[in-house]
Structure formats: structure tokens, C-alpha cells
Regions:
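Extended substrate-binding grooves/exosites of carbohydrate-active enzymes
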Residues: 1-192
Length: 192
């Protein structure tokens, strides 16, 4: 049996044989090293990165992307997954990583949108995910059976703060959105 790298090479060759005009791509997870033999097999590559959610800080994203691009300028690099969970009822005074708050999710995506737009060498970026979704094995943030990384709630009724950030970047439709409206009970003086 061929190993993982040989398998990917065989699959890539098969795609090229079937349709030589079709671009091929591969998604890697964060732990695939920069010197992996998996690099360069396909025409395009992407990484699933969650710096600032599962580990590290969200500022680690730009460091990693720039380091990869410096070491492999010949590879068309994309970001196939990135995101942070945001539960609309979680509204802390000071959002922080893995607090599952809507406000941290918005802060994370504000940073990501800025750094991704500043890197024209990225061939693609994919927010994970448009909607919260069911996932039987999950039990995080006090909500069993659900992944809360969506920009919109599971029932498709409530657009989270981060949704409006991307709407502002990606839509030509004029709109006004007031951030923080679900953060109504704030600590401190009422006139602050």
C-alpha cells in the first residue's frame, strides 16, 4: 500500500489525467509542517488555522501566513478554515479567547478580515462557518451538540456582530449596524 504522500500524488495525477485543465487543491491542518512532503503536490494549497481560538493568539495568523509565504513563495496559499465561536447571550465586559462570546468572535473576525485583505498572495479565504450547526460530539461553551462558529445562529434568525463586518466588506448594499446592542446590561455607572 502506498503511503499518504504517494496516495496524494496518485490522486493528483488521476485528476490531471481526467481533466488537465482543472486545478487541484489540498487542505492541511495547522500541524502540517512547513517542510512537509505534502507541499507542492497540488496546484493550490490551503490551511485550516484557528490561531486565536484553539491555541495561540489571533495575531499568530499573520506571522504564520507571512512565514509560510516567505519559505514557499511558489505555492498558491489559501486559508480553508478560520473562525471563533460566538454565542449571542455571552456578552462579557472584556472579551477574551475561548470565552465563547459574540464580542470576542467579532473582535477575532475584525482582525482576520484586516490581515487577510492585506495579503494579496492568498488565493482564497473561507470563514468557518456561515451558520452555527449541529455536531453531536461537541460540548463546548455550555451548548452541547452545536458548533457556534457561524456568523448567523443555528435557527438562521439572528445575524451575529461578525456577520455585519463581512457584509460591510463584501456587499455594495448601503446599511447601518449598531454594534453591541445585545450587550445591554453593562457593569459600572449608568451614565458611562
Amino acid at each position: 500500500k502506498p503511503g499518504l504522500v504517494e496516495n496524494h500524488k496518485d490522486l493528483n495525477a488521476l485528476v490531471k489525467e481526467i481533466d488537465p485543465t482543472r486545478l487541484t487543491t489540498m487542505a492541511h491542518v495547522s500541524m502540517v509542517p512547513l517542510d512537509s512532503r505534502l507541499h507542492g503536490i497540488t496546484d493550490l494549497e490551503s490551511y485550516n488555522h484557528y490561531f486565536g481560538w484553539y491555541g495561540g493568539k489571533y495575531t499568530d495568523n499573520e506571522k504564520w501566513l507571512d512565514n509560510f509565504h516567505e519559505k514557499h513563495p511558489e505555492i498558491c496559499l489559501g486559508l480553508s478554515e478560520y473562525g471563533a465561536e460566538g454565542i449571542i447571550t455571552y456578552q462579557p465586559d472584556e472579551p477574551k479567547c475561548r470565552d465563547y462570546s459574540e464580542s470576542y468572535q467579532a473582535e477575532y473576525h475584525e482582525h482576520m478580515a484586516e490581515i487577510l485583505m492585506a495579503r494579496p498572495y492568498l488565493w482564497s479565504t473561507h470563514v468557518w462557518n456561515m451558520f452555527d450547526f449541529g455536531c453531536a460530539a461537541r460540548n463546548e461553551g455550555g451548548t452541547a451538540g452545536r458548533n457556534n462558529k457561524g456568523l448567523v445562529t443555528l435557527d438562521r434568525k439572528i445575524k451575529k456582530e461578525a456577520f455585519y463586518l463581512y457584509k460591510a466588506y463584501w456587499s455594495r448594499e448601503p446599511f447601518v449596524h449598531m454594534c453591541g446592542r445585545r450587550y445591554a446590561q453593562r457593569p459600572g455607572d449608568a451614565d458611562r
